[in-house]
């Protein structure tokens, strides 16, 4: 993680909350809390709803450094795992709302 973020912000990769991935592939939260194939756009919207001031950055995910991907940097609220769980929960709510509205 960049020194400029240390302590105040956290770097969130979609893989960190992806229920289709194992822990060794990058998932950080329990399966029951994780989301199936989260998109960066969903994570950004969820973080906005939670007031976490998200910023999207182009970067290579350390576990697959040869692929260029996006990451989301958000304000730190409590522990990193707590923040990841909050965002995953909000993504689930977003998907449920969209499903109900037929989008």
Swiss-Prot record:
Mainly resides where?
cytoplasm
Q: Which cellular compartments is it found in?
A: Cytoplasm
Ordered alphabetically, the record's keywords are: Cytoplasm, Ribonucleoprotein, RNA-binding, Signal recognition particle
Which SUPFAM superfamilies does the protein's record reference? Answer: SRP19 (SSF69695)
Q: Which GO terms describe its cellular component?
A: signal recognition particle
GO terms (molecular function) for this protein are: 7S RNA binding
Pfam families this protein is in?
SRP19 (PF01922)
Q: Does the keyword Signal apply?
A: no
* UniProt keyword annotation of Manganese present: no
Q: Which GO terms describe its biological process?
A: SRP-dependent cotranslational protein targeting to membrane, signal sequence recognition
Q: How does it assemble?
A: Part of the signal recognition particle protein translocation system, which is composed of SRP and FtsY. Archaeal SRP consists of a 7S RNA molecule of 300 nucleotides and two protein subunits: SRP54 and SRP19.
- Which PANTHER family would you find in this protein's record? SIGNAL RECOGNITION PARTICLE 19 KD PROTEIN, SIGNAL RECOGNITION PARTICLE 19 KDA PROTEIN
Its annotated function is as follows: Involved in targeting and insertion of nascent membrane proteins into the cytoplasmic membrane. Binds directly to 7S RNA and mediates binding of the 54 kDa subunit of the SRP.
The UniProt entry, under HAMAP family, shows:
SRP19 (MF_00305)
Q: Which family is annotated?
A: Belongs to the SRP19 family.
Q: What is the name listed in the Swiss-Prot or TrEMBL entry for this protein? A: Signal recognition particle 19 kDa protein
Instruction: Give the gene name.
Output: srp19
